[in-house]
Amino acid sequence: MNKYEIMLIIDPAIDMAMANEIVESVFDKKNINKVVKLENSTLAYPINKSSKAQYVVYTLEAKSELIAEFTRRANIAKFIWRQMVINLDTEKGFQRSKKAFKHRIAKDAKVANKGTGVKQLIENLEKTMSHKAKPSFKKEVKKSN
């Protein structure tokens, strides 16, 4: 069984319980891990002559045959305007981001350890800018008398 995330855009006039009935009729209640009703929002373009819609996200575990059956039933239901099903097990980048982030931190730490000091960096910049007007990178402390 694979992990899936299903996002539905449904009619704002319809109760969310109707969408839950379709999802629960295809998948058992025990296979549905999480249901999140997002806020009613204004759409970028009208769907079915409406500029507002409800978003509902389901996280569940199921077989691929059940996903095909859900898609068929969602296409029949008039109150489900759009649906999107994502297989979280095979989705590229879903698990990769954590590894890439750890790799990036390790790489940055190596560069920081090898790096030259700030004073040396400022001196090198001043040497290379000798033909131009030298900006002063050093902190100037005003002494008050």
UniProtKB/Swiss-Prot annotation:
What is the protein name stated in its UniProt record?
Answer: Small ribosomal subunit protein bS6
The function of this protein is:
Binds together with bS18 to 16S ribosomal RNA.
Query: Per UniProt, what is one GO molecular function of this protein?
Result: rRNA binding
Q: Which domain of life is it from?
A: Bacteria
What's the encoding gene here? rpsF
Q: Which InterPro entries is this protein grouped with? A: Ribosomal_bS6 (IPR000529), Ribosomal_bS6_sf (IPR035980), Ribosomal_S6_plastid/chlpt (IPR020814), Transl_elong_EF1B/ribsomal_bS6 (IPR014717)
| Pfam families referenced in this protein's UniProt entry, alphabetically | Ribosomal_S6
From which source organism is this entry? Mycoplasmopsis agalactiae (strain NCTC 10123 / CIP 59.7 / PG2)
Q: Which GO terms describe its biological process?
A: translation
A cellular component term from Gene Ontology for this protein is:
ribosome
This protein's UniProt keywords: Ribonucleoprotein, Ribosomal protein, RNA-binding, rRNA-binding
* Family listed: Belongs to the bacterial ribosomal protein bS6 family.
